[in-house]
Amino acid sequence: MRYNSNYLMYFCLVLGIFANIYVIIKITLGSSHILEYFQKNSNLSPKCEINVNNLLSFIENRHFLDLEQKNSQKSQPNYEKTLQLMLFAFPSGGLGNKLFEIISLHGIATSLQRKAVINATNPSFIETLNRNIQPLFPKLADQFTLRIIPDSLVTHQQTNWGRCCVYDDPSRFLNRSDQNLILDGHYFQSFKYFHHIRPQVREWLAPSKLQAMRAEILLPAKFRDDFLICTHVRRGDFQYDGLHRPSDATFTRAATDFLVDLYRKSHERVNVVVLGNDIHFAYTVFEDRVAHFTFLQKPVNNSYDYSLPQISPSYTAILTPTLTPEIDLAFSRLFCDVTLITAPSSTFGWWLSYLAKRTATTYYRDILESKDGVAGEMHPEDFYPPEWIKLKTDLNGKISKY
């Protein structure tokens, strides 16, 4: 019996040596393939069709290491006909606007059985992909092809014109014979353009390991097992642009308190995280619920026509310093059990909710109640998914669900 055990041990040792030699050979051959890839591509003559991988991935060499594996995992149909959008807000809008347009492009292209294409001759499109999309969401950038298509070979079709948040059903273009179709329209801010590919969208926008680590730092360890309500506030240019309505202090606090009371009925530990672009506003609204507020000085005054409520449930409000939008998205994905959109036309607040935990529930302020100017360009049933819950305020300031 002892002889058999030793024999087996020697056999496993020899087998392990051969396995290691095999792995080394595979790694060496893989490296040579990568070198050949660089050499071949350095001598390529210009082509009309440029893949996003080849154009943008030079930024990080590690992207090339994943290229072969990514291509092998793709199972997308290779459509011959192409689709473009005019990408009205893509170069100049915030991250929420950019995501709506580029993901709507892919969703519509899938519905029309066409290849999603971005105009390679437009330098602002290339710069936006390079700076704002590929570094944050490389999997999303991989879904698009850059092409140089002469305008004489493109058929323009006007749709979704002049309104941000209305679904203009693209299925009427399904049987068009045009080889290259471009839809001239604005914003394309409706979940209906891409809701049929939501699992893929969540995969493309999943946080990187570094983003996830940075998001975890924002939440003290003692709160990580709690039921977390994530209140998103949006101020900034919304205060001055004459169209949008920023987060209102009274509604933000009242709606958050309402949700804490609601979920205390089913969860023992309920706390609040405030995400957004105005940390001083957040402190003013939740001053009596904030703990460990040490990363900046307290605001010197209250300019929000707001006073703390006399009656409020007990909870801790965790304020997050504004880092970068993708960190807030990562935080929502990892920790938010409930999201609250306090500025109803905020596209970033929308994405924060759409990409939250799979089991998360979203609440939002009634845009008509807020007197937001975007309401005139919006069909709420096209902008907010039906499972999201609208909140209203009565004459006494009490919050309730519709």
Swiss-Prot record:
GO terms for molecular function: glycosyltransferase activity. It is found in: Golgi apparatus, Golgi stack membrane. Its EC number is 2.4.1.-. Keywords: Glycoprotein, Glycosyltransferase, Golgi apparatus, Membrane, Signal-anchor, Transferase, Transmembrane, Transmembrane helix. One of its GO terms (biological process) is protein glycosylation. The chain crosses the membrane at residues 7-27. N-glycosylated. It is a single-pass type II membrane protein. Its main location: Golgi. It comes from the Eukaryota. Pathway: Protein modification; protein glycosylation. InterPro entries: Alpha-1-2_FucT. Residues 28-402 are lumenal. One of its GO terms (cellular component) is Golgi cisterna membrane. Residues 1-6 are cytoplasmic. Glycans are attached at residues 119, 175, 301. Expression is restricted to pharyngeal neurons and gland cells. Selectively catalyzes the addition of fucose in alpha 1-2 linkage to Gal-beta-(1->3)-GalNAc-alpha-R, Gal-beta-(1->3)-(GlcNAc-beta-(1->6))-GalNAc-alpha-R and Gal-beta-(1->3)-GalNAc acceptors but not Gal-beta-(1->3)-GlcNAc-beta-(1->3)-Gal-beta-(1->4)-Glc in vitro. May form oligomers. Belongs to the glycosyltransferase 11 family. PANTHER family: GALACTOSIDE 2-ALPHA-L-FUCOSYLTRANSFERASE-RELATED (PTHR22898:SF2), UNCHARACTERIZED GLYCOSOL TRANSFERASE-RELATED (PTHR22898). This is Galactoside 2-alpha-L-fucosyltransferase. It comes from Caenorhabditis elegans. The lineage of its organism: Eukaryota, Metazoa, Ecdysozoa, Nematoda, Chromadorea.
